[in-house]
């Protein structure tokens, strides 16, 4: 039992020693890694300073301090140049120092503000363009009737130019007005013609036809049949004449109460019987009541 217990204790101690050794080895390896990483960063920083000084043709210095505040390394290696550049920078005004300094937080904030202002300006410009477009649309709506009238006038002018035989619009309007008024005028003329014809027939019923002999100064009355025939014939002829005059001058026809010829014809006997054929003589018409 004692031997077994002693072996167990030895194994536990050996395990503890191994774990302690592992921890120390891990810590030393992590420290070495940190050191290498730091040295690589130092080399990268000094390399960038050299490139910046060469490409931009400016004075660049790097001052590297340790954790305890001791100076570890400078670039360039000549510390007098580094001291000179540091003194010149310290003598600058705060405003001049800010020009040479870049704050990322301030830069980003300024960038955001600039973008916001730009977006606001774009919105204002868009609103102004939309308002101008509305004004132009309203003007186009107001000018549309005038444009239509102008195009209609130009079309009429072109049509009259291309067709010189076509009458002008004023003559067309006069013709249309004449067509509208012609039925009324024809109705009036027809009424006047009917009235003149009826009055003529009434007046002619009161006339008798006599033949006058210039030799013995005698009269011969034409029979009623011949008188009515001549009356109807003269009525038709004078009716046509009266209608022609009415349609031409729109005036009522006036008939003379007495008509006679001036040139004598052949003589005839006053006392001849009624059935004897009379000679041609001057016909005369006398009214009677």
UniProtKB/Swiss-Prot annotation:
<feature type="region of interest" description="Disordered">
    <location>
        <begin position="151"/>
        <end position="197"/>
    </location>
</feature>
<dbReference type="InterPro" id="IPR036879">
    <property type="entry name" value="TF_MADSbox_sf"/>
</dbReference>
<dbReference type="GO" id="GO:0000981">
    <property type="term" value="F:DNA-binding transcription factor activity, RNA polymerase II-specific"/>
</dbReference>
<dbReference type="GO" id="GO:0005634">
    <property type="term" value="C:nucleus"/>
</dbReference>
<dbReference type="GO" id="GO:0000987">
    <property type="term" value="F:cis-regulatory region sequence-specific DNA binding"/>
</dbReference>
<feature type="domain" description="MADS-box">
    <location>
        <begin position="18"/>
        <end position="78"/>
    </location>
</feature>
<feature type="compositionally biased region" description="Polar residues">
    <location>
        <begin position="187"/>
        <end position="197"/>
    </location>
</feature>
<comment type="function">
    <text>Probable transcription factor.</text>
</comment>
<dbReference type="GO" id="GO:0003700">
    <property type="term" value="F:DNA-binding transcription factor activity"/>
</dbReference>
<dbReference type="GO" id="GO:0046983">
    <property type="term" value="F:protein dimerization activity"/>
</dbReference>
<keyword id="KW-0804">Transcription</keyword>
<keyword id="KW-0805">Transcription regulation</keyword>
<dbReference type="GO" id="GO:0045944">
    <property type="term" value="P:positive regulation of transcription by RNA polymerase II"/>
</dbReference>
<keyword id="KW-0539">Nucleus</keyword>
<protein>
    <recommendedName>
        <fullName>Agamous-like MADS-box protein AGL93</fullName>
    </recommendedName>
</protein>
<keyword id="KW-0238">DNA-binding</keyword>
<dbReference type="InterPro" id="IPR033897">
    <property type="entry name" value="SRF-like_MADS-box"/>
</dbReference>
<dbReference type="Pfam" id="PF00319">
    <property type="entry name" value="SRF-TF"/>
</dbReference>
<dbReference type="InterPro" id="IPR002100">
    <property type="entry name" value="TF_MADSbox"/>
</dbReference>
């Amino acid at each position: 039992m004692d031997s077994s217990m002693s072996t167990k204790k030895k194994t536990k101690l050996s395990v503890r020693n191994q774990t302690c050794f592992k921890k120390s080895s891990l810590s030393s390896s992590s420290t070495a890694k940190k050191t290498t990483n730091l040295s690589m960063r130092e080399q990268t920083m000094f390399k960038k300073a050299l490139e910046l000084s060469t490409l931009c043709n400016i004075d660049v210095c790097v001052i590297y301090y340790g954790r305890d505040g001791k100076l570890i390394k400078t670039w360039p290696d000549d510390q007098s140049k580094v001291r000179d550049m540091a003194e010149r920078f310290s003598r600058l005004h705060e405003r001049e120092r800010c020009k040479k300094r870049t704050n990322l937080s301030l830069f980003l904030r300024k960038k955001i503000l600039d973008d916001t202002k730009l977006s606001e300006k774009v919105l204002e410009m868009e609103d102004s363009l939309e308002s101008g477009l509305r004004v132009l649309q309203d003007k186009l709506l107001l000018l549309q009737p005038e444009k239509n009238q102008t195009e209609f006038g130009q079309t009429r002018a072109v049509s009259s130019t291309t067709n010189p035989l076509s009458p002008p619009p004023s003559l067309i309007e006069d013709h249309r007005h004449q067509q509208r008024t012609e039925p009324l005028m024809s109705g009036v003329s027809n009424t006047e013609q009917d009235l003149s014809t009826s009055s003529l027939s009434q007046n002619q019923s009161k006339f008798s036809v006599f033949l006058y002999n210039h030799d013995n100064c005698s009269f011969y009355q034409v029979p009623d049949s011949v008188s009515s025939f001549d009356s109807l014939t003269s009525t038709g002829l004078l009716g046509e004449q009266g209608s022609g005059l009415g349609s031409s001058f729109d005036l009522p026809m006036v008939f003379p109460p007495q008509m006679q010829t001036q040139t004598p014809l052949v003589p005839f006997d006053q006392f001849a019987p009624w059935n004897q054929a009379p000679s041609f003589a001057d016909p005369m018409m006398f009214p009677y009541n």
